[in-house]
């Protein structure tokens, strides 16, 4: 089968002929229809420090996808040939304390599709049936293929009550932009998103952000004044991993504010903890998606009218995968879809 593999311990990714993955009794075999390129895939492509420590070579990568079930393990129930599915990319152990308590997204023995095991940038993918999610008929393949990052956005955005609240999102990558759309859809008042990439800030405006602020050109406190905000943001969603962005968030949060952190700093990050203490802030780390509550919420949000389609900006056939990675690497894109049909 065709597959995109991290074939060598250097920058790049290669289209190869790989063996079709073997199934177990509890697995599904999925024929991939569309995949999307993630920031993680770009880290692997660029072969940065994290990738060098994490990714075994060779490895078929990718973890954002939609496909069709073409074979079913003998112990699997609840799926049939022809079901359209995406799936949770975190494969969990099922026997640690968090798994047994139903907090599977916090499994301490997680294995990642396309990171620690064969991924979805291939004509076929095998995953445990437990990890598969059936896609409703009224949700397109394009949208289903980005459920993984959309889930990061939904999990982060819905960590706290948003109705009537003022929300600050730092980082206008695709996940931050989708989070802005979610916040507006569920009833936030002002949703302000910050970045220095004007292309992505314009995408955020299309997705419904109240204000998309280029912090290289505008002062965040001036924007707050313009919006009539006198006490600070009620909820902060940190999506950038950039220390200066988080510092700005701490400066502009209201007393009693709540912060959800998804962005991963490049290293240790010092902050003024007195602001956290004296403002009485709550800070919550976000990892992955809640299994499978986040997945149900994703489908329901789209079915209730949330439109995240503007975040998809580029489509390529798999033979043109290099153009897709170039588009993602340029910073002048939203989500990039690769078609395997």
Curated annotation (Swiss-Prot):
Record GO terms (molecular function): L-threonine 3-dehydrogenase activity; zinc ion binding
Residue numbers binding Zn(2+) 1: 38, 63-64
Main location as per UniProt: cytoplasm
Cofactor dependency: Zn(2+)
Cofactor, free-text remark: Binds 2 Zn(2+) ions per subunit.
Any single GO CC term annotated in Swiss-Prot or TrEMBL for this entry: cytoplasm
Secreted keyword on record: no
Compartments where located: Cytoplasm
InterPro entries: ADH-like_C (IPR013149), ADH-like_N (IPR013154), ADH_Zn_CS (IPR002328), GroES-like_sf (IPR011032), L-Threonine_3-DHase (IPR004627), NAD(P)-bd_dom_sf (IPR036291), PKS_ER (IPR020843), Zn_alcohol_dh (IPR050129)
Catalytic site positions: 40, 43
Main EC class the enzyme belongs to: oxidoreductase
Residues that, per the record, bind Zn(2+) 2: 93, 96, 99, 107
Annotated positions binding NAD(+): 175, 195, 200, 262-264, 286-287
Assigned EC number: 1.1.1.103
Keywords of this entry: Cytoplasm, Metal-binding, NAD, Oxidoreductase, Zinc
Origin: domain of life: Bacteria
Function according to Swiss-Prot or TrEMBL: Catalyzes the NAD(+)-dependent oxidation of L-threonine to 2-amino-3-ketobutyrate.
Sequence similarity: Belongs to the zinc-containing alcohol dehydrogenase family.
Subunit structure and binding partners: Homotetramer.
Protein name listed in UniProt: L-threonine 3-dehydrogenase
Species of origin: Shewanella sp. (strain MR-7)
């Amino acid at each position: 089968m065709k597959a995109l593999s991290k074939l060598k311990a250097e920058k790049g990714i290669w289209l190869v002929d790989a063996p079709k993955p073997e199934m177990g009794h509890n697995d599904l075999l999925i024929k991939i229809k569309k995949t999307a390129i993630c920031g993680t895939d770009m880290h692997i492509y660029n072969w940065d420090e994290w990738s060098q420590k994490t990714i075994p070579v060779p490895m078929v990568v990718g973890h954002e996808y939609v496909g069709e079930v073409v074979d079913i393990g003998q112990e699997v129930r609840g799926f049939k040939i022809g079901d359209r599915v995406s799936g949770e990319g975190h494969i969990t152990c099922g026997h640690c304390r968090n798994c047994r308590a139903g907090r599977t997204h916090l499994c301490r023995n997680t294995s990642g599709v396309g990171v620690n095991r064969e991924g979805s940038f291939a004509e076929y993918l095998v995953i445990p049936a437990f990890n598969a999610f059936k896609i409703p008929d009224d949700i397109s393949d394009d949208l289903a293929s980005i459920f993984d990052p959309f889930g990061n956005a939904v999990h982060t955005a819905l960590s706290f009550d948003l109705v009537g609240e003022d929300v600050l999102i730092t980082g206008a990558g695709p996940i931050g932009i989708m989070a802005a759309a979610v916040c507006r859809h569920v009833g936030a008042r002002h949703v302000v998103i910050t970045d220095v990439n004007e292309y992505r800030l314009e995408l955020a405006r299309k997705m419904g952000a109240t204000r998309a602020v280029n912090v290289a050109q505008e002062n965040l406190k001036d924007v707050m004044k313009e919006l009539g905000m006198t006490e600070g943001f009620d909820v902060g969603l940190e999506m950038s991993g950039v220390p200066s962005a988080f510092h700005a968030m701490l400066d502009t949060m209201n007393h009693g504010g709540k912060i959800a952190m998804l962005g991963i700093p490049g290293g240790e990050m010092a902050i003024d903890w007195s602001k956290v203490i004296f403002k009485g802030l709550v800070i919550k780390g976000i990892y992955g998606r809640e299994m499978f509550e986040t997945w149900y919420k994703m489908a329901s949000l789209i079915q209730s009218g949330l439109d995240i389609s503007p975040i998809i900006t580029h489509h390529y056939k798999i033979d043109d995968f290099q153009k897709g990675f170039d588009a993602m690497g340029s910073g002048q894109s939203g989500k990039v879809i690769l078609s395997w049909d």
